[in-house]
């Protein structure tokens, strides 16, 4: 992903740029375009860089591989930020992630793994789980 991708995204109507990595070029282009920047982070160095470059939300990826305990370890030195979990987040784990400080989720496989007709129901299941978890926190 690069500056041209950001520009093309804006032309196509994007409001948010979610990137797989932390890139000063991409974050700067995103901010200059007036869009929300959500870079992928997995290490303290990537987190510090993303924040220094102006990221709005930190995309913790791959969430299921790194795990909740790792998130807590890298999140604590960087308080006051908004986090999104992506990569293998299961419906059954939503409450654990929300309690660990995750504000939102990027979902692919958990929504599309069944038939197309089931996608709306899975979206509702995730919405319900997120709201219940936030209300019980």
Regions found by a protein language model. Give the residues of each.
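Short, small-residue-enriched loops and turns at beta-alpha junctions
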Residues: 2-5, 16-17, 64-66, 91-92, ...
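Glycine/small-residue-rich loop that forms an oxyanion/phosphate-binding "nest" at active or ligand-binding sites
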Residues: 1-44
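Catalytic cores of alpha/beta
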Residues: 2-12, 45-53, 70, 83, ...
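Hydrophobic faces of well-ordered beta-strands that scaffold small-molecule active sites
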Residues: 17-19, 37-40, 58-60, 82-87, ...
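Glycine-rich phosphate-binding active-site loops on the catalytic face of alpha/beta enzymes
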Residues: 21-26, 60-68, 100-125
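N-terminal/domain-start segments enriched in small and hydrophobic, helix-friendly residues
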Residues: 41-58, 64
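C-terminal helical cap(s) of enzyme catalytic domains, especially alpha/beta-barrels
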Residues: 30-35, 98, 113-137
